[in-house]
């Protein structure tokens, strides 16, 4: 028992085109001359594009000198060096590097750019684009014009502080116009804002993260080409949050009177802008007194914020099978960093009144009639089954002729794809034979041979099992000659095959996955098909072997030592992961998902458990070719490894069963969270039913301890409620590449941050783990204990 304290320490919620050279948020470099602060700006262009780098001289009488990687740049057939700009046409990979301009005979830098040339950019890859924007322009010269003026009608935008702001001015013209932004009538650059800006020229957009009051003003987009110019102005107002102590709804909790043995619920509705801390207290007596020497009442803490409790759960106090000792005064105490508030209610417990027993002949008649009807129903069912068995004819003789049936693909493709999901891709011949099938539930079937992928069965040596999948099993094997460059050298592969109890449906799924992998092709960051054994035996599908298992277990095995894990804490991991290693994992997975999206393939379940790691630490996405029946998924049933698939699914996939590339982006955001928690469990301790409500209310997971603010904002963009507002995988690759290039190779993880809240010891629901903080939503950590002074008494009651 403790006296009721009036102070609670709580944390508040912190909660060929031509490209312009101002694309990404600038950051100051360490080696720039101290005379003028120059920002290094990242510039990404596609092969064959035209690059224009601007330079504003301080003295127009002095000549300008351009340098690339420290060497002077001179004019050529592709390069034009001017007094105000450097223009490079038909750029190639060799044009990548660091460009700077300065006055001749002076060391002062005027501008500085990092240029990276990648594969040719295509606006068609941006899923945020509208079709009418892509089709704008018919070859005739025309001045700029707005393509979606209906989306630009809202000129005043008011957002709370810390939110992300995005302005768009979609336009078109011929030639393709350029766009630049003004703030309050002046040129708006990234260095003018502490958090930087993102300029996505392909989307005609300006993005500002973590808005602050200084961002208020008028933002004007100016779109122009040589035939004209248009502009549009938005007004931004950033609203500061008004701090206040928690507000409790009047009348709650309410007094209650119940009989002994009943169940009781007390409700307490709390309203607070800052994250509240809620406790339920019961007033007690000590030595016949309800108050201590200092005038504070004696109380027992019945319920407080814990590891796996949410605000919604804390707002209700449950008392089951109440006794006379439970009668008394109960208090709901809520506080935040501003102050506290509390409401109290009384519970009255009455003795049970024994009711006189009356014979209810109607009830007895109902029970007897029900029993008779049940017995009659069972008798009828037994008689019908006996009659059906007597009517069965003898088995038909074996079929003597060859019958064929088409195997239809069951994979996830976009409706506009050229690959029709109902087109027969493989025709299987069913063999008639007096012998039984090789597998008990699978008919003996003959698959047509594909010379491009067929592998000789005698050159394959099967090894130990690696695991079981949805419809088969996977074993390790040695394949001699499968590598065309080394025909006599064995290569370790993974072989997918049916289980002993496989069915015709399982075979159909395995063939569909094999055909899907053939069509998708090869990429470094996906599991690639190597071959197949389809003749003279069971079907074997040969794929690449990843020796280090799936990404989830790979990360957990490399967590820093000394933490409270379920496995041996004395075992030191063989490899130590740096922050750059984690960013590299995320970058490689994004590359693989970008490739699958380019092939119009929707994965539906991108998660760390579906990413495999090779001996060289290459990330490879697996199971993208599986045929999934989304209408038959048991959303409440855990998988074999204890994971809940719904925790990776986008809201539109959960509630409307709509699967798109945007829903894959949402799942990728959860995968990012897994990476930076080193294999943590998403939404630990949150029941599935509660998760549905939390997602609808806009709750999102908190920033992992070893994750930068920039990467966390990428996660939040992936979890945008509106699918079209989420980034594309191409944009995610660009963002990760930029973070990767700016990350130090010796930036190790912070070992002082506890990982046990993400440990596999915490079950997915009804967890009793006692970590220091299990806040999985965007809230700051709470203090370890509220300021309720206490010490232990021998009878277990807390006393002041």
UniProtKB/Swiss-Prot annotation:
Glycosylation sites: 77, 90, 112, 218, 255, 287, 308, 321
Chief localisation class: membrane
Upper classification of the organism: Eukaryota, Metazoa, Chordata, Craniata, Vertebrata
Free-text comment on this protein's domains from its UniProt entry: The second and third Ig-like domains directly interact with fibroblast growth factors (FGF) and heparan sulfate proteoglycans.
Record's protein name: Fibroblast growth factor receptor 3
Record has Glycoprotein as a keyword: yes
Record PTM Phosphotyrosine, positions in chain: 635-636, 712, 748
PTM per Swiss-Prot/TrEMBL: Autophosphorylated. Binding of FGF family members together with heparan sulfate proteoglycan or heparin promotes receptor dimerization and autophosphorylation on tyrosine residues. Autophosphorylation occurs in trans between the two FGFR molecules present in the dimer.
Gene: fgfr3
Organism: Danio rerio (Zebrafish)
């Amino acid at each position: 028992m403790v006296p009721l304290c009036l102070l609670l320490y709580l944390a508040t919620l912190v909660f060929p085109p031509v490209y312009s050279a101002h694309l990404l948020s600038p950051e100051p470099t360490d080696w720039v001359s101290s005379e003028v602060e120059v920002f290094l700006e990242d510039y990404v262009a596609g092969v064959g594009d035209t690059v224009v780098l601007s330079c504003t001289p301080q003295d127009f009488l002095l000549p300008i000198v351009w340098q690339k990687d420290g060497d002077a740049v001179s004019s050529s057939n592709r390069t034009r060096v001017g007094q105000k700009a450097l223009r490079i046409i038909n750029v190639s990979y060799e044009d990548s590097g660091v460009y700077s301009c300065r006055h001749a005979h002076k060391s002062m830098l005027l501008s500085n750019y990092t240029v990276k040339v990648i594969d040719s950019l295509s606006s068609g890859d941006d899923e945020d684009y509208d079709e009418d924007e892509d089709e704008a322009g018919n070859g005739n010269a025309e001045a700029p014009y707005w393509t979606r003026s209906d989306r630009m009608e809202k000129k005043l935008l008011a957002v709370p502080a810390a939110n992300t702001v995005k302005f768009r001015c979609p336009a078109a013209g011929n030639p393709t116009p350029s766009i630049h932004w003004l703030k309050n009538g002046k040129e708006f650059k990234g260095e003018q804002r502490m958090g930087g800006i993102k300029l996505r020229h392909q989307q005609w957009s300006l993005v500002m993260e973590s808005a602050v009051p200084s961002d208020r003003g008028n933002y004007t987009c100016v779109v122009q080409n040589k035939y004209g110019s248009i502009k549009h102005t938005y007004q931004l107002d950033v609203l500061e949050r008004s701090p206040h102590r928690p507000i409790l709804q009047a009348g709650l909790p309410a007094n209650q009177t119940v009989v002994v043995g009943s169940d009781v619920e007390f409700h307490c509705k709390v309203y607070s802008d800052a994250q509240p801390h809620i406790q339920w207290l019961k007033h007690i007596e000590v030595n016949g007194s309800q108050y201590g020497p200092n005038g504070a009442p004696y109380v027992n803490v019945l319920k407080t914020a814990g590891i796996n409790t949410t605000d919604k759960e804390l707002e209700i106090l449950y008392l089951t099978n109440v006794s006379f000792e439970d009668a008394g005064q109960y208090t709901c105490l809520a506080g935040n960093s501003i102050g506290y508030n509390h409401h109290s209610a009384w519970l009255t417990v009455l003795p049970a009144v024994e009711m006189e027993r009356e014979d209810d002949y109607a009830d007895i008649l109902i029970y007897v009639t029900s029993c008779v009807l049940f017995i009659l129903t069972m008798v009828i069912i037994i008689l019908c089954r006996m009659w059906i068995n007597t009517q069965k004819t003898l088995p038909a003789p074996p079929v003597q002729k060859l019958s064929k049936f088409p195997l239809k693909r069951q994979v996830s493709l976009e409706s506009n794809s050229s690959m029709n999901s109902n087109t027969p891709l493989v025709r299987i011949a069913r063999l008639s034979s007096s012998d039984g099938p090789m597998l008990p539930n699978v008919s003996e079937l003959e698959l047509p041979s594909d010379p491009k992928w067929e592998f000789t069965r005698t050159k394959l040596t099967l090894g130990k099992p690696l695991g079981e999948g949805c419809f088969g099993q996977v074993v390790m094997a040695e394949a001699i000659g499968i590598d065309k460059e080394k025909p006599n050298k064995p290569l370790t592969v993974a072989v997918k095959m049916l289980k002993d109890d496989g069915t015709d449906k399982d075979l159909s799924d395995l063939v569909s996955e094999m055909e899907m992998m053939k069509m998708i092709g090869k990429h470094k960051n996906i599991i690639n098909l190597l071959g197949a054994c389809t003749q003279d035996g069971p079907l074997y599908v040969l794929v690449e072997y990843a020796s280090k298992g799936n990404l989830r277990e790979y990360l957990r095995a490399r967590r820093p030592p000394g933490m409270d894990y379920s496995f041996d804490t004395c075992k030191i991991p063989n490899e130590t992961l740096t922050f750059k290693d984690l960013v590299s994992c995320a970058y490689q997975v994004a590359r693989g998902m970008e490739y699958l999206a380019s092939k119009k393939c929707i994965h539906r379940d991108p998660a760390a458990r579906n990413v495999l790691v090779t001996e060289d630490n290459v990330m490879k996405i697996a199971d993208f070719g599986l045929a999934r029946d989304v209408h038959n998924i048991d959303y409440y049933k855990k998988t074999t490894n204890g994971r809940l698939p719904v925790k990776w699914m986008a809201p539109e996939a959960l509630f409307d069963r709509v699967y798109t590339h945007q829903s894959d982006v949402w799942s990728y955001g959860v995968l990012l969270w897994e990476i930076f928690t080193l294999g943590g469990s998403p939404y630990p301790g949150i029941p599935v039913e509660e998760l549905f409500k939390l997602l609808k209310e806009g709750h999102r997971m908190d920033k992992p301890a070893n994750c930068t603010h920039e990467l966390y904002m990428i996660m939040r963009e992936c979890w945008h409620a509106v699918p079209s507002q989420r980034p594309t995988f191409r944009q995610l690759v660009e963002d990760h590449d930029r973070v990767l290039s700016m990350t130090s190779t010796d930036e190790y993880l912070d070992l002082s941050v506890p990982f046990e809240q993400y440990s596999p010891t915490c079950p997915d629901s009804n967890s009793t783990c006692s970590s220091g903080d299990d806040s999985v939503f965007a809230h700051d950590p709470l203090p370890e204990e509220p300021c309720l002074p206490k010490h232990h008494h021998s009878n277990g009651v807390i006393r002041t």
